[in-house]
């Protein structure tokens, strides 16, 4: 398809550099630049904003973000094969793209941006690290976080877990952590054929906004409670949280011990954590 930013079509770029997506890195390349623009627009206004991107690959989404006016993109890429392609984008947008070769799970993202700078996180996350990265971004001790919003692509099943509420089959630890500190929504689905190679599942773009004042709670305690409760989700709470105090803890929190984890609201999980 024709380029929309003055750079060559992505398929041509990938072919010229002999790039193919590596399954071991959880890569799936997006070719459709109209689709990458749709993802970037979902994030909200980009003028004057620094964008953090993880796993840019050949830079389809990077190009969309820059073409929509982002002040700067800081992209963390583990695959050195992609660096020459990203260097071409960097040359096309002088001073607006910084590429860091490294492991996103070991990166201190907040340290990459000057304090007080408006930041949005936009990424087609590698499938094998996406969930852990999200949890890392959701659970800093200080809140509000350094980011204004997160617009992230996941496998659809993961997206459903992020936005799920109590009573939903997809509700679990991820839904509690996301629901505690953010307002999240599934923006739109992306079919397998949009990628190369096509994954076996549909993907979805999730948009998250931080809550100004989430309910006060110790991060570590909330993690302990959700891990215990959903670790044995089919059992009654008196059994699943037995290691944390069982019925004594539940009585203190005012929660019926015969209930199961998936019936508890985010607020009830926070109460439970605060009673530890």
UniProtKB/Swiss-Prot annotation:
S-adenosyl-L-methionine binds at residues 28, 30, 55, 77, 103, 124. InterPro entries: KsgA/Erm, rRNA_Ade_diMease-like_C, rRNA_Ade_Mease_Trfase_CS, rRNA_Ade_methylase_Trfase_N, rRNA_adenine_dimethylase, SAM-dependent_MTases_sf. It is found in: Cytoplasm. Its main location: cytoplasm. The keyword Methyltransferase applies. It catalyses: adenosine(1518)/adenosine(1519) in 16S rRNA + 4 S-adenosyl-L-methionine = N(6)-dimethyladenosine(1518)/N(6)-dimethyladenosine(1519) in 16S rRNA + 4 S-adenosyl-L-homocysteine + 4 H(+). The keyword S-adenosyl-L-methionine applies. Transmembrane segments: none annotated. The gene is rsmA. It comes from Agrobacterium fabrum (strain C58 / ATCC 33970). Its EC number is 2.1.1.182. PROSITE patterns: RRNA_A_DIMETH, SAM_RNA_A_N6_MT. It is an enzyme of class 2 (transferase). Specifically dimethylates two adjacent adenosines (A1518 and A1519) in the loop of a conserved hairpin near the 3'-end of 16S rRNA in the 30S particle. May play a critical role in biogenesis of 30S subunits. This is Ribosomal RNA small subunit methyltransferase A. GO terms for molecular function: 16S rRNA (adenine(1518)-N(6)/adenine(1519)-N(6))-dimethyltransferase activity; RNA binding. Keywords: Cytoplasm, Methyltransferase, RNA-binding, rRNA processing, S-adenosyl-L-methionine, Transferase. Belongs to the class I-like SAM-binding methyltransferase superfamily. rRNA adenine N(6)-methyltransferase family. RsmA subfamily. GO terms for cellular component: cytosol.
């Amino acid at each position: 398809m024709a380029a929309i930013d003055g750079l060559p079509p992505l398929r041509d770029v990938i072919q010229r550099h002999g790039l193919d997506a590596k399954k071991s890195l959880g890569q799936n390349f997006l070719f459709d630049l109209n689709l990458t623009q749709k993802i970037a627009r979902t994030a909200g206004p980009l003028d004057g904003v620094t964008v953090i991107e993880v796993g840019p690959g050949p830079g389809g989404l990077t190009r969309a973000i820059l073409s929509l006016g982002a002040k700067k993109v800081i992209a963390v890429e583990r695959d050195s094969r992609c660096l020459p392609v990203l260097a071409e984008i960097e040359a096309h947008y002088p001073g607006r793209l910084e590429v860091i070769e490294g492991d996103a799970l070991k990166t201190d993202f907040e340290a990459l941006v000057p304090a007080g700078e408006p930041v949005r996180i936009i990424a087609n996350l590698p499938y094998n690290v996406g969930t852990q990265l999200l949890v890392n971004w959701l659970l800093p001790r200080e809140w509000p976080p350094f980011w204004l919003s997160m617009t992230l692509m996941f496998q659809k099943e993961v997206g459903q877990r992020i936005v799920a509420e109590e009573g939903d089959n997809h509700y679990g630890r991820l839904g509690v952590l996301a629901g505690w500190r953010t307002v999240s929504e599934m923006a739109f689905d992306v079919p397998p054929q949009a990628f190369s190679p096509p994954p076996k599942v549909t993907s979805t773009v999730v948009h998250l906004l931080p809550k100004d004042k989430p309910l006060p709670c110790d991060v570590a305690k909330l993690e302990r409670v959700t891990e215990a409760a959903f670790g044995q989700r089919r059992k009654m709470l008196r059994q699943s949280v037995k290691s944390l105090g069982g019925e004594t803890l539940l009585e203190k929190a005012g929660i019926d011990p015969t209930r199961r984890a998936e019936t508890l609201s985010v607020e009830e999980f926070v109460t439970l954590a605060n009673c530890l």
